[in-house]
Curated annotation (Swiss-Prot):
EC id: 3.2.1.8
Residues annotated as domain GH10: 209-500
Catalytic activity of the protein: Endohydrolysis of (1->4)-beta-D-xylosidic linkages in xylans
Family: Belongs to the glycosyl hydrolase 10 (cellulase F) family.
Cited PANTHER family: ENDO-1,4-BETA-XYLANASE 5-RELATED, GLYCOSYL HYDROLASE
Active site (catalytic residues): 332 (proton donor), 439 (nucleophile)
UniProt-listed InterPro entries: GH10, GH10_dom, Glycoside_hydrolase_SF
Pfam families, per the entry: Glyco_hydro_10
Protein name as annotated: Endo-1,4-beta-xylanase 5
Native source species: Arabidopsis thaliana (Mouse-ear cress)
Glycosylated residues (UniProt): 197, 261, 307, 346, 490, 536, 544
Lineage, opening ranks: Eukaryota, Viridiplantae, Streptophyta, Embryophyta, Tracheophyta
Gene name of this polypeptide: XYN5
GO MF annotation terms: endo-1,4-beta-xylanase activity
Amino acid sequence: MKNINNGFFLCMLLLLWCFVHSGISIDPFSPSDSLKTECVMKPPRSSETKGLLQFSRSVEDDSDEEWKIDGSGSIREMTQRIQLHEGNIYSFSAWVKLREGNNKKVGVVFRTENGRFVHGGEVRAKKRCWTLLKGGIVPDVSGSVDIFFESDDKEAKISASDVSLKQFSKQEWKLKQDQLIEKIRKSKVRFEVTYQNKTAVKGAVISIEQTKPSFLLGCAMNFRILQSEGYRNWFASRFKITSFTNEMKWYTTEKERGHENYTAADSMLKFAEENGILVRGHTVLWDDPLMQPTWVPKIEDPNDLMNVTLNRINSVMTRYKGKLTGWDVVNENVHWDYFEKMLGANASSSFYNLAFKLDPDVTMFVNEYNTIENRVEVTATPVKVKEKMEEILAYPGNMNIKGAIGAQGHFRPTQPNLAYMRSALDTLGSLGLPIWLTEVDMPKCPNQEVYIEEILREAYSHPAVKGIIIFAGPEVSGFDKLTLADKYFNNTATGDVIDKLLKEWQQSSEIPKIFMTDSENDEEEVSLLHGHYNVNVSHPWMKNMSTSFSLEVTKEMGQRQVVRVVINA
């Protein structure tokens, strides 16, 4: 036996007896499976077997067998392993339950040949019913791995059923993404153009210009945008939503107690409003003790600290009421608990309550890091972030808050684990609340542009994700991780990727879709991204025949929508 010592107690058990291409698996892209959180008496069956590496051991409800965790926290080793190949994506799934205890964390861990542990996903398991555990791994080298269950309870006795590891090539994964994007981001619109007598108009020309996309890919900005006309022009020509990196934070607006200064934030907001750019508020408070104004930690009286904290909430939220799309009310309050330690366990929940009273229409986020990007995280895991939001919404008076999850997305400079990321988004999305990626970046590295595109496409292809903000900019902005343009505003390779995705996801109003109704069918169908459009219908032979109208294409309208246009001619 080998003991694990990595800073916290882990109990693990090796999965046994593997073979290829057999059994049952969960499709990681299935809408019916992706947000599944209920505990079921019997795991549902699936006919999905393509690309499957299947574990044959399945412990059923009426069996006396169970996988027991060694009480010493040791690994019980077996010799059999699974061979994984670099460049492939492996999606893991299993139905798990507890024989003893309840509501305990159960996760999957992959141990590589060099002894490194890769955490692949986790779930809260329950007693006497089955919960779906999902995750996965993207190996950076080919080799064999051992697969373990882990639990934070040394007394845990875990039963598992239908344990599977499904292999995808990157091309297969991308194809799945594209298919899902067509379902969740677009709808087919059929135009039927007729005269008042219902006779079809042959050869009508339909021009469609998008005025407001439903899904926004945005970018953060900082105070340097006030100092550079080139930065302002570069930004306004691309992005329709932003957040300010530091300019709205408490340690910026009140460096000295009682002396508030919102000059930079106000000026940046004015620039955004003048250019039709939405602003997401970041942040009212920050639960990290090191991220307070320097004078705040010196306050020893809890009543005094409460007074200045309430003053801060009232000040910033009243000032920007109705001007922002959302707020990080208490930033990173899963990782940190400064206000809870100083003011009580319900501090965060009570601050969300006050924020809701001050601006009930704004979306309020729990905003955390290492939730979707770092699979070794033990603090702000998807399960714990979900539970924090549930705790806030359960606080008296908070049930009507427009809640949302902010997954920051500070990725390491290496191949992202897309299978883990998708499973993490599934867990967060099971709340039924919007998810935004709020601070996406990655240190400079070879293939940065490839990795960033993979990350952004993974988010865009998930039904719970409603928008993305990257922490990036041109060289003059000082964003030294995701630099999108040089000092002359010429694109970097990563900048080319962002421009490509903006064009793909947000149809430019300067390049309208133009087509002619079919002379035989007298109707035309086009696939449109969800959003708002201006539509013009005219005819090249009839100069007086023209009509224009606004059109909103939404997911709620279904996969197909019929637009009937009646021409007065």
